[in-house]
Amino acid sequence: MVISVSLGAQSYPILLEPGALTRAGEHLSLDRRVLVVTDSGVPQEYAQAIASRCRQSRICTLPAGEGSKSMDSYHLLLREMLRLHMDRGDCVAAVGGGMVGDLAGFAAATYMRGVDFYNIPTTLLAQVDSSVGGKTAIDLDGVKNAVGAFHQPRAVLIDTDVLRTLSPRQTAEGLAESVKMAMTCDASLLSLIETASDLTAALPEIIARSLRIKAQVVEQDPTEQGLRRVLNFGHTLGHAIESCAGGELLHGECVALGMVPMCAPPLRPRLTAILQRCGLPTECGCTAGQLLPYLLHDKKAASGSVTAVLVDEPGTFRMETMTPEEILRRWEERNA
């Protein structure tokens, strides 16, 4: 299956099929120097499958975890690109989850003012969301995605076979992003996630439908000037929770926690039940006082306020300018 992201000169395909990694040479332009970036939590054969099809390559394996999305790791990748004598005709390939894609994409965006970038996501979260859209970033001083750029990939290669290696927790994390898109854009997708007798068997359809939503939103708003902010549903509180939790919670788990307060009170029990069905947390110990400093540093904030995404009915959304204090009031009242 091919899903196109139509952005004029920056258009690219999302190639979605079982066994796609074994056919990477057919789909990606790899007859050049390629820095293949992965992490220690990804089976090494995935990166090798890409590297073996390159004219010249170097695999850079980072420690797994958000801690690698740092300035130090960014500098490491740039140095590896220099050692490989890469020029503007060469490329970077990210093989891994969201951390790898964000970091490798940012290195590609800034090395020699930009080189080609291929995203080969190996987690469900990255497959349904972060691999598409060109957002790249690193964290700085505990602030998530504080430094970044928009840099669209040349292609996204999704091999659904790799999902077999994920833990139940990693699968649940990815489902959080699909729930986010369903809540804001597709009520029937929400019903599928809510009622499917076998969520694992339904994953290919969930991935494809999530990607179509993401592609349509990115096409209309590639640099997040308006509509694309809908994809931040759950993320304003979610990023604050992620920073507050200090690595104990995964990104998708924090998004799940951040969605419930931002939907209408009558909808919260249904959303909570869906998240629990997916294996996601719906409670954590972060207090409003602990979350406030991180909300104040939210990159989406302007003049002391944030444009928050709210959901009153599944498949719909509205945006409202809110202060951090107003958002935290929703956090405190989420179970009311």
Enumerate the language-model features and the residues they cover:
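Active-site segments that bind and position negatively charged phosphate/pyrophosphate groups
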Residues: 192-290
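Alpha-helix C-terminal capping segments
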Residues: 103-114, 244-248, 264-265
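C-terminal charged capping/lid subdomain of soluble metabolic enzymes
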Residues: 176-178, 267-336
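Short glycine/serine/threonine-rich phosphate/pyrophosphate-binding segments
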Residues: 99-106, 127-128, 239-240
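ATP/NTP phosphate-donor binding region
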Residues: 1-91
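Generic secondary-structure signature for well-ordered alpha-helical cores
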Residues: 83, 152-155, 161-168, 176-188, ...
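Residue-level signal for inorganic ion chemistry
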Residues: 17, 36, 70, 121, ...
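A glycine/threonine-rich phosphate-anchoring loop and its flanking beta-alpha core
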Residues: 15, 29, 106-196
